[in-house]
Swiss-Prot record:
Organism per entry: Sinorhizobium fredii (strain NBRC 101917 / NGR234)
NCBIfam families linked: PRK00110.1 (NF001030), PRK12378.1 (NF009044), YebC/PmpR family DNA-binding transcriptional regulator (TIGR01033)
Lineage: Bacteria, Pseudomonadati, Pseudomonadota, Alphaproteobacteria, Hyphomicrobiales
Key word Transcription regulation present: yes
Any one GO molecular-function label of the UniProt entry: DNA binding
Record's protein name: Probable transcriptional regulatory protein NGR_c27950
Swiss-Prot/TrEMBL keywords: Cytoplasm, DNA-binding, Transcription, Transcription regulation
């Protein structure tokens, strides 16, 4: 769990510092449109759309942008995006999972493969690394939601599996199938969550040194910079000393 938390935290901080808002909003809008197109355009009747909108709001995406993304799906003029997952190994044999929404599988696959190759890694077949991850729900709250004891008690009552609290906030994990029920129960006690999403949580982590960590961060940065890529997950773990250097 420590490795996953470290990875989450470093990506969280780096994302805050480096993210280009227009690109981030574009990716959030794409998820909203795909979610709205996959079911009812009403978030009350479409759990995926409700989560997509909630996460967009957490990133301060303007209300007009959110409504436009929903209407785009309802209007029938939205591009046909496919959900694809790529799996491979980065520097040091670290497992990497890439989730994308694309209207051109060949383009996206070529771009992702090229990034892995340039980083000294290799793209594998679907399933080549995901067996070493668990698909779980992740619900995050800011520290203002309450102290660690209050959040822990709420998480236990809601049926969550794990809770961690650090300087970035509270992170609650639950079973993939229970995301909706757990997040709803938590909302009744703690208020609206900062984010609610499904993630790939590594079963075990791989320790890496500073050089490998820098290479991995560069690979992940490049992947996240691709317009089609929505999420990137990995299983590397770094020491507190290296973490401090990379976060500086």
């Amino acid at each position: 769990m420590a490795g996953h938390s470290q990875f989450k935290n470093i990506m969280h901080r780096k994302g805050r510092q480096d993210a280009v808002r227009s690109k981030m909003f574009s990716k959030l809008a794409r998820e909203i449109t795909v979610a709205a197109k996959s079911g009812m355009p009403d978030p009350a009747m479409n759990p995926r759309l409700r989560l997509a909108i909630q996460n967009a709001k957490a990133q301060s995406m303007p209300k007009d942008n959110i409504e436009r993304a929903v209407k785009k799906a309802a209007g029938g003029d939205a591009e046909n995006y496919e959900e694809v997952r790529y799996e491979g190994y980065g520097p040091g044999g670290v497992a990497v999972i890439v989730e994308a929404l694309t209207d051109n599988r060949n383009r996206t696959a070529s771009n992702v493969r090229s990034m892995f190759t340039k980083a000294g890694g290799a793209l594998g077949e679907t399933g080549s690394v995901s067996f070493s991850f668990d698909r779980v729900g992740e619900i995050t709250y800011t520290l203002s939601a309450g102290d660690a004891d209050k959040v822990m008690e709420a998480a236990i009552e809601s049926g969550a599996d794990d809770v961690t609290t650090d300087e970035d906030g509270h992170t609650i994990l639950c079973g993939f199938e229970e995301i909706g029920d757990v997040s709803k129960a938590l909302e009744g006690v703690l208020g609206e969550a900062e984010t609610v999403k499904a993630i790939w949580k590594p079963q075990n982590t791989v320790p890496v040194d500073e050089e490998k960590a820098q290479s991995l961060m560069k690979l992940i940065d490049n992947l996240e910079d691709d317009d089609d890529v929505q999420n990137v997950y990995s299983n590397f773990e770094v020491s507190e000393e290296v973490l401090a250097k990379l976060s500086a």
